[in-house]
Amino acid sequence: MKRHVLLAGIAAMMLTACNQKTETTLTLSGLDPVKFQTTVNDAQTQLYTLKNKAGMEVCITNFGGRIVSIMVPDKNGVMQDVVLGFDSIADYINIPSDFGASIGRYANRINQGKIVLDGDTIQLPQNNFGHCLHGGPKGWQYQVYSANPIDSTTLELTRISPDGDENFPGNVTAKVLFKLTDDNAIDIKYSATTDQKTVINMTNHSYFNLSGDPSKAATDHILYINADNYTPVDSTFMTTGDIISVKETPMDFTTPKSVAQDINRTDFEQIKNGNGYDHNWVLNTKGDLSQVAAKLTSPISGITLEVYTNEPGIQVYTCLFYTSPSP
């Protein structure tokens, strides 16, 4: 396993079906496409590779719509893999994780696993401290998406979710479009249609370590979040419904600082509740894709990740509850 650790972010990538050859051709990140070929619930899994003119490479598997690797140049021009991922489909199947996944139907937590639609209360799986997390234990991150490689930089994944899937109402057809641009941006677009009133909240769940060295903690990374407010959580990581200013708290990243600077401030209740950072920030961008929502930089590699989104919030998770299995 590649042990690249830190923070959930959102980005985009590029593609070429790289596992339909008789001979084994490794990806730039050293992945063997053959190790991603299997059948899950009668559906075929594959590894797809996107590559742009600048030499950036992104590998994606249609199992869970997962980003497996992102290869980008560091300040010296050396290519580095900056996300956490496994080296085979067997590990993704046998070791429960959300690494790089396209989460659905509903990312993050639903309080006590209950939704109310047209006055009717619907009970969903309670798979995390009594709440429904990431669509339940059989969320889309554990299902096989159908794949449509559009060109060498674009991959479209589709998931058809039947009515009653994890007790969510409505037949849903969801699409995730990955586009790798020549300026080393990964554009991810989500869309979904349904025949009933329901709830949908999709995201990408990649973990970044921009140093390119999995033996180094990513807490030395410098983080900026374009947000004056955040939503606090209780001891079960459920949002309380409040919106609170970040000013003069460890939650303030309006001035860039290292993730490590306040991550051990257990005298601050929110750091204690989240065992670090596992919170949503209310973005100042208000859906403006021309404004950066967050920025993360490794002082070692010089690699910078910028996040742009039309959503109202961004979740930052420092992965302090995950214990990496042996490779």
Model regions and ranges:
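Extended, loop-rich substrate-binding clefts of extracytoplasmic carbohydrate-active enzymes
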Residues: 26-30, 34-44, 51, 121, ...
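Active-site loop/turn microenvironments that scaffold catalytic and metal-binding pockets
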Residues: 78-140, 222-223, 238-245, 250-253
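Conserved small/polar residues in nucleotide/adenosyl-binding loops
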Residues: 322-327
